[in-house]
Amino acid sequence: MSALTYRELYAPAHFGNFYETAADYEIKEMLQEAIFWGFNAYGDWFDAADLKNPLNNPRAEFLTPQAIWERKKSSYRIASRLGLQTSWIVTPNHVFTDQLLPEIMAEMDGDDRFMGQLLCPSRSDGRKSILETQRGLLQDLKNTGGHIDYITGCPFDYGGCSCKKCTPWIITWGQLMADLHDEAREVFPDIRVRLIGWWWTDEEHELFKAWADSKQPGRFISLAEHIRYDETQPTPGIVLPEGCKPQAFVHIGYNNRNTHRDVYGTWGPLIAPERIEQTVRNLETNGFDGYSAYSEGASDDVNKALLAGLSSGKYSSSDNVLKAYAERYFGITGSQIESWAEWLSGWADPLSVNLTNARKEFDVLKAGVRSPEWRLEQWECRLRLFEEHSRVIEQKEWNEIANTAAERFVLERDRMYREVWKLGLVRHVLNYRYSQPEWFAHYQSQHEKFNRSSEM
């Protein structure tokens, strides 16, 4: 495969994921490995959910907003020192809680995509608050040694306003991005604008192109088109402004298909060799310039290697990437390299894994590992989770076997989050409360009764 030009790891530090909880040395190691596989750009998004503006801090406190902001600034500095291009990703009218004055808040009726802590940018005070806050963050980042190459905007998740003045939203958002770009150039004069097409409709692409070509020609240098779940390319026929290069927004936080409830790794690490290889081939064939790889942390480590390794032209197939991955991180040689690649690939469709065989093969392969670390341990966690889940659902009624297996499942999942991935207070869609086994509610209602019985 030939290399795609722009290969961004979009790693939002939020919701208690690895990127939020990691120390500097861990971020550095992660980015060094990202570079090894082939990424050449790094992006983060300051998700304001539940946070005050960290710069609105008259008492000089160091609370959650300040801690998260320091994490992000440090990650950007590390990325720049390592030679990565840097992207400041914004959903511009999603703001901090202390900006949410009732008279300038957005309207969110009529479109399910409109959500978040939103201000109306058509209200002058709302627009001023948005622009001043973003410029303040960028200035603080620069003052503390950071550098940003691109400001990258997304209109949804979070974002939107349905008031008459903001309709159509995609145009209001586009003008807001242009204004933000002007503000950002006061801090970083050479900064350029990229866009993300997550959740855009075909009609919005048409509207945006007509507006941008007329009102903002040449401003937007690329647009990462949305690849929907289980697809391997953006919707054909999307139109872009003149001079705006086609890129893709690639979700690496699930397996080959989104058929199991473990998006974002709530049931263990993820792997999508067929989906990612076909995606890269499609992007190359259809003339795409690059991509933004949406990652939520350690669980998609293999998928990072797959996407970067293939899209950089370093490896010609997913199988070759997986062999290199096993050799690099498991310290193995010879025939075991191919066996590990085959074992890992089997988890691309987790519901089809023969758990008895997978356990036998894993125990044999693990014995040959010379450098065990978290990248290996996370896969044993995944195997254990599916083993315990299988023991539960094999029971025709809730009995001691089911209760014990369920307890082991819950313990293993917590251990994976805390001891293996070193996660913090995991929040929102990354929390496994949204992807519980079908038996979990029954377990909650029954396990105390079984525990009391066993103590009698």
PLM feature segments, named:
Residues 5-9:
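Transmembrane beta-strand segments of Gram-negative outer membrane beta-barrel proteins
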Residues 1-3:
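Contiguous, structured surface segment used for ligand recognition
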